[in-house]
Design a protein with these regions (language model features):
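Short helix-initiation/N-cap motifs at beta->coil->alpha
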Residues: 63-74, 161-189
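C-terminal motif of bacterial Sec signal peptides marking the signal peptidase cleavage site
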Residues: 19-22
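Bacterial signal peptide processing site
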Residues: 24-26
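A conserved helix-loop-strand patch within extracytoplasmic ligand-binding domains
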Residues: 106-155
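Short, polar/charged alpha-helical segment
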Residues: 32, 39-64, 71, 75-77
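Beta->alpha turn/N-cap motifs
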Residues: 40, 67-69, 79, 83-93, ...
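Periplasmic-binding protein-like
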Residues: 107-118, 143-150, 207-271
Length: 271
């Protein structure tokens, strides 16, 4: 009996020791962080943040790549990663509403802005009464475009329309503009259409024909845009030291320069 007791005691002590080791391994390392990013050209931007974090703050950043926009928030919510950097606020808000995630933004990165482009005019003063203005037809980017047209004074929308207004929400149109909704990939080609005076195009499609917001846009979203991209973490992790260090590293001149290089001058600081 005594032998059995000693054996059980030894096993219990061993299990207890292993449990303690396990707890130690699960503790968060303030000098290490796993960050979810989207694979592709834009991955080059957090790669620079990774280097800045190591050089300036002694933080080891492990980048975890994803091929779509759904999995990074799912992985973050489950605790598989500590933060992610890929989405703007309207998208995050919709994810929180649809999926009930307990996630929070802890820092801004960049606005990759939509802008107004034209081959017919060089300023809004030249925009004639009754001109046709092309905008993307998907709900998110249509709303984004209409809000930008309102911001520059071309139209006025109903109060309280939020981030998804439609042309039915236009209540003032002093130049009697004709808003033409097109598939987003068609917008760059619409600039050659004799009937289109102006097109609102996002950075991805504008860059395909060599246009950049800062250089070629007649008007451009600014850093106050609700579409600024974010660094996001879990609510219970928002004050973690490794998260704070990563935000500081991302919001650096080195990362800003990298973003502008990758997006041909199309990145606007969001901080």
């Amino acid at each position: 009996m005594a032998f059995k007791f000693k054996t059980f005691a030894a096993v219990g002590a061993l299990i207890g020791s292993l449990a303690l080791v396990g707890c130690g391994q699960d503790e968060k390392d303030p000098n290490h962080i796993k960050v979810g990013v989207i694979v592709g050209a834009e991955q080059q931007v957090p790669e620079v943040a990774q280097k800045v974090a190591k050089d300036k703050y002694g933080l080891d950043v492990e980048l975890v790549t994803f091929n779509d926009y759904v999995l990074p928030n799912e992985a973050l919510s489950k605790g598989d990663i500590d933060a992610n950097a890929f989405q703007h606020k309207p998208y995050l808000d919709q994810q929180l509403k649809d999926r009930g995630y307990k996630l929070v933004a802890v820092g801004n990165t960049f606005v990759y802005p939509i802008a107004g482009y034209s081959k017919k005019i060089k300023s809004l003063d030249e925009l004639q009464d009754g001109s046709q203005v092309a905008v993307p037809n998907d709900p998110t980017n249509l709303g984004r475009s209409l809000l930008l047209l309102q911001k520059v004074g071309l139209i006025k929308l109903k109060d309280g329309v939020g981030l998804l207004p439609t042309v039915l929400d236009v209540v003032e149109n002093p130049k009697n503009l004709k808003i033409v909704e097109l598939e987003a990939p068609q917008l760059p080609r619409s600039l050659d259409d004799a009937q289109i005076a102006l097109a609102v195009i996002n950075t991805t499609y504008a860059s395909q024909i060599g246009l950049t917001p800062a250089k070629d846009g007649i008007f451009v979203e600014d850093k106050e845009s609700p579409y600024v991209n974010l660094i996001v973490t879990r609510e219970d992790n928002k004050d973690a030291e490794n998260v704070k260090k990563f935000v500081q590293a991302y919001q650096s001149d080195e990362v800003y320069e990298a973003a502008n290089k990758v997006f041909n001058g199309g990145a606007v600081k969001g901080w």
